Amino acid sequence: MAQTMLLTANAKVDLRSKESLVERLKPKPLSSLFLPSLPLRFSSSSTNASSSKFTSTTVALFKSKAKAPPKKVAPPKEKQKVEDGIFGTSGGIGFTKQNELFVGRVAMIGFAASLLGEAITGKGILAQLNLETGIPIYEAEPLLLFFILFNLLGAIGALGDRGKFVDDPTPPTGLEKAVIPPGKSFKSALGLSEGGPLFGFTKANELFVGRLAQLGIAFSIIGEIITGKGALAQLNFETGVPINEIEPLLLFNIAFFFFAAINPGTGKFITDEEED
């Protein structure tokens, strides 16, 4: 009897040891690596108690990629307008430098013609047009006053001076200037462009001379309205003489204004649209 009980006890121990060995050899789930291990044998009461106390934590294996911050786009820079004058684009009534150049050329021709006419006839520009002179300025013809004001404002660039003149590329100098290129005329050896003007004025110089002519014709008219004398008589030049007896300096000035008016200057005129 005692031997039977001993064998039974040994069998129970062997069974338990075998059972524990089988459980050890069983593959463990992946969650056991991250979650705390629980006892295999537990009662229902202990299960309820432990489940109420146990809280699982979620572990992220892969993190979401952080979004890159949006790139800041710099606002486009406002392009400056092409301005090259006294009042700038904001001033005046919309004249461009090309318009001013045209008005200046007309003023040069008019001023030169008035000087030549006064030198030959002895009459000022207003007397040649049979306009009343030798009166106060406020009694002058309104159209004549407008003409004076227009020339004065044009001479200082107040009519609008949008745009600018750009010079042509610099011609070669030194030995390159002295050598005549193949197929070119003798004009190239003198430093003059093949198809350009003979006179060495740029359009910016031409505009300056035109403004001087506008000032000259405006002040000569103002002086003649008040004094009754023409521009040459106010400067004590001899007038009413043949053309061959006119003062050489006066003839040079007349020829200069005529030639500057008809000879196109070098360079080109650019505006805001051409800059874009």
UniProtKB/Swiss-Prot annotation:
Keyword rRNA-binding: no
GO CC annotation: chloroplast thylakoid membrane; photosystem II
Gene Ontology biological-process entries: photosynthesis
Segments passing through the bilayer: 106-126, 140-160, 207-227, 242-262
Coiled coil feature spans: none
Transit peptide (first-last residue): 1-67
Record key words, sorted: Chloroplast, Membrane, Photosynthesis, Photosystem II, Plastid, Repeat, Thylakoid, Transit peptide, Transmembrane, Transmembrane helix
Residue spans of the Sequence repeats: 62-168, 169-276
InterPro entries: Chloroa_b-bind
Subcellular location: Plastid, Chloroplast thylakoid membrane
Domain of life, source organism: Eukaryota
Bilayer topology: Multi-pass membrane protein
Family: Belongs to the ELIP/psbS family.
Described purpose of this protein according to its UniProt entry: Seems to be involved in non-photochemical quenching, a process maintains the balance between dissipation and utilization of light energy to minimize generation of oxidizing molecules, thereby protecting the plant against photo-oxidative damage.
The protein's name: Photosystem II 22 kDa protein, chloroplastic
Organism: Solanum lycopersicum
